[in-house]
Structure formats: structure tokens, C-alpha cells
From Swiss-Prot:
It comes from Bdellovibrio bacteriovorus (strain ATCC 15356 / DSM 50701 / NCIMB 9529 / HD100). Belongs to the enolase family. Its EC number is 4.2.1.11. Mg(2+) binds at D242, E283, D310. One of its GO terms (molecular function) is magnesium ion binding. This is Enolase.
Length: 422
């Protein structure tokens, strides 16, 4: 029986030492699904609401007791007795109880914890791994990792405008081999930084955060690390950026290396980098409400460059439909806590893939050891995954889960490889 008999919630710590919500759902079969909710540093204005307590005397106002209590007192009584396998129905109940567009009543952190824990309990009842429970027999492709090895922006206080400089390994049509390549490049980069007398301390997502003279210097460092590690830039390792441009947008211009530039000038920089470097993906290249620049950049670069909307779309089908109508962007970043339920996440991914958008499953800068997104990346047939650098346990946990899934799939498993960007 998949009848839900217990829903428990608690306050735990995320990777930044901030409180977050953890939920456990247990069924009559004795199976328990546990989910911990992540939290972002650079968040989109259109994201679902993360409910914090605001009590400055406790965790500096960042406690989540209100969300935890909402799970216990408002959600649990409504779903105990229901079948855990009725995911769509349960997610609808969660939204109905909340009653707001952005889930500000119960908190998206409360709702998501329950939604994911229900799915994990149901998967165990069905004796299936989560990726197979979510995706069925078609869940067989491993995503390409976008590895954030150099941090800037809101993730590091080091003078770099761009938030994430990433390497993208596509080696031997193998996830495991690509992960190995990324790891070797990461350690090679560390040696290069140390030799230059630069800091090898890491930021929130495990990438290095040295003080550099320019954004372009960061790109050059990545190119050197790729070559020194024995790989071929533009052949089996590529580059990707998360600009997080909303953080830089002020009064119609973008803060850039100590000054301000126009959207047209910023687009020109991206185009010049695309010619000089093996750059395959730019995330949030423009601010979340700078639709004109998104449309212009997609028209000029969209045929050859992946242009990911994160703050632009916030995993929300309504925002994504706006982008499709305007022809803004060509790829969707998928963050489950931006929308708040597994069902709505599926709807956003399905809408994107039907319209030939690439989909990229993503962590948040405030993560936990929960590996759910690795299973969801495979289960939802996402082309790529973002889960940080090659250190910090909350990041490597997801990479390791994908190794297990690749092993579990055996000969049926396929790696998206370069096809992830076509």
C-alpha cells in the first residue's frame, strides 16, 4: 500500500550554514522518502516564495520554523491517508492549501519538501529508483555536466562580474569519463592558480574564487587548465557562463569591470568571446525583465549559442510561454525550488522540450547532501546538469549519484555528449 501514514518536517542546515526544510513522508508499506530543500543566493524576482521566520534573534532572521510548522500543521493533515503515487493530485492539494500564485502562504520551501518526499516514498513503494519512477522506461540518458570551477558575482567577493565560469566535458560518449576529465581540469586549474600566487579558496559552489583583473582573464585560465590537463578545447571540452546579469542591471545599463555598459555593448562582448573561445552556453546573459535584449541576443546568437533563461523563466510555465512568444532564449534552467512542486517542474520541462528548448537541471548555491536533482535530470530527460564544482560534498554527491545511475543503466545508458547542445 502506498497510503501516506506519516509526514514529518524539521529544520536542518544547508551548505552555507543557513536553515532549510527537510521533510520525511512514510507509507503503510514502511517506506520513507526524505527530501531537503535548497536555497539560492542570486534569486529571480519571479521565483516562488521561500518562507523565512524573520526573527533576528534566531539564525539572524533566516530560520524556517514557520515553514516547518506549516508542513506539520497545515499540510500533513490534508495528505495523510492519500496514496503517495497520486503525485499530481497531491501537488494540486498543496497548491490549493496555499492559495497564492507564488506560494507565499505556506512557503515554497515547505511545499517542495513535501512534494519531493512524496515522490521518493512512492518510488520506494514501487521498488523503482527515483529516476525510473519519474521517467519510466525512457529515462536512459545521462546529462552533460556544466562544472562551475571559477566563481564570481554573488557567489564570491573577488571583483569578477560573471557569477560562474564553467567547463563542459564531452569525452568518449561517457558520463564517467567526462566527470574524470572535469576533475583533472579542476585540479590542474588549482595548480595554475597556486603557481601564480592566487587564492585557491573556494566559493559557495566549490569553484575557486581568486581575485583576477578581468572576466576575460578567467576564461584564459580555464583554457590553460584544459590544455595542461591534456584535453582539447573545442573538441572534447567547452566553456559555459552564468552571467547572472540581473545582479548587474542598474537603470538600463550593466555594471561591468568598474564601469557601466549598454545592453548592446554587452551583447558585443558575448559575440567576441564566442569567436575567441569554445563557448557553447550563456546563462542569464541579460536581466530577468530586459526582454528587448533577450530577444535581440536570441536573434543574433541563438542559432549557434545556447542561451539559458534562469531568472528569466524561473522554471515557471507562464514565464516560459512569454519567452516562447517573444522568441527570447532557447534553453530552460530547471530549479525545483523556483516553482515549488514536482508536477509544475515536469510541466515546465515538458513545455520547453516540446518547443525544442534544451533543459538544464540545476542545484542552488545553498545545497544539501540530497541527491534528488541527479535522478530528476535523468528522469526528466534533461540535456545537462549544473551541480557545482568538483569539491564540497553537497556538490560531488550529485555527481556520484549520476555515476550510480549510469552503472544501473548499464548498456542501455547513453550520454548526451555534444548532442546536448544541438
Amino acid at each position: 500500500m502506498s497510503e501516506i501514514i506519516s509526514v514529518i518536517s524539521r529544520e536542518i542546515l544547508d551548505s552555507r550554514g543557513n536553515p532549510t526544510v527537510e521533510v520525511e513522508v512514510t507509507t503503510a508499506d514502511g517506506n520513507m522518502g526524505r527530501a531537503a530543500v535548497p536555497s539560492g543566493a542570486s534569486t529571480g524576482a519571479h521565483e516562488a516564495c521561500e518562507l523565512r521566520d524573520g526573527d533576528k534573534n534566531r539564525f539572524l532572521g533566516k530560520g524556517v520554523y514557520k515553514a516547518v510548522d506549516n508542513v506539520r500543521e497545515k499540510i500533513a493533515p490534508e495528505i495523510v491517508g492519500l496514496q503517495a503515487t497520486e503525485q499530481v493530485y497531491i501537488d494540486k492539494i498543496l497548491r490549493d492549501i496555499d492559495g497564492t500564485e507564488n506560494k507565499s502562504n505556506l512557503g515554497a520551501n515547505a511545499i517542495l519538501g513535501v512534494s519531493l518526499a512524496v515522490a521518493k516514498a512512492a518510488a520506494k513503494d514501487c521498488r523503482l529508483p527515483l529516476y525510473r519512477y519519474v521517467g519510466g522506461s525512457q529515462a536512459s540518458r545521462l546529462p552533460v555536466p556544466l562544472m562551475n570551477v571559477l566563481n564570481g558575482g554573488a557567489h564570491a567577493n573577488n571583483g569578477l562580474d560573471i557569477q560562474e565560469f564553467m567547463i563542459v566535458p564531452t569525452v568518449n560518449n561517457s558520463y564517467a569519463e567526462s566527470l574524470r576529465a572535469g576533475t583533472e581540469i579542476f585540479h590542474t586549474l588549482k595548480k595554475i592558480l597556486a603557481k601564480k600566487g592566487l587564492s585557491t579558496a573556494v566559493g559557495d559552489e566549490g569553484g575557486f574564487a581568486p581575485k583576477l583583473g578581468s572576466n576575460q582573464e578567467a576564461l584564459d585560465l580555464l583554457m590553460n587548465a584544459i590544455v595542461d590537463a591534456g584535453y582539447d578545447p573545442g573538441q572534447n571540452v567547452f566553456l559555459a557562463l552564468d552571467v547572472a546579469a540581473t545582479e548587474m542591471f542598474k537603470e538600463g545599463k550593466y555594471e561591468w569591470q568598474g564601469g557601466h555598459i549598454s545592453p548592446t555593448e554587452l551583447l558585443g562582448i558575448y559575440k567576441s568571446w564566442a569567436e575567441k573561445y569554445p563557448l557553447v552556453s550563456i546563462e542569464d546573459g541579460f536581466a530577468e525583465d530586459d526582454w528587448d535584449s533577450w530577444v535581440q541576443s536570441t536573434a543574433q546568437m541563438g542559432s549557434t549559442m545556447q542561451l539559458i533563461g534562469d531568472d528569466l523563466f524561473v522554471t515557471n510555465p507562464k514565464r516560459l510561454r512569454m519567452g516562447l512568444e517573444k522568441k527570447a532564449g532557447n534553453a530552460l534552467l530547471v530549479k525545483v525550488n523556483q516553482i515549488g512542486t514536482l508536477t509544475e517542474t515536469y510541466e515546465a520541462v515538458n513545455l520547453a522540450q516540446r518547443n525544442k528548448f534544451r533543459t538544464i537541471m540545476s542545484h542552488r548555491s545553498g545545497e544539501t547532501e540530497d541527491v534528488t536533482i541527479a535522478d530528476l535530470a535523468v528522469g526528466l530527460n534533461c540535456h545537462q546538469i549544473k551541480t557545482g564544482s568538483l569539491c564540497r560534498g553537497e556538490r560531488t554527491a550529485k555527481y556520484n549519484q549520476l555515476l550510480r545511475i549510469e552503472e544501473d543503466l548499464g548498456g542501455m545508458g547513453l550520454y548526451w555528449d555534444k548532442a546536448a547542445f544541438r
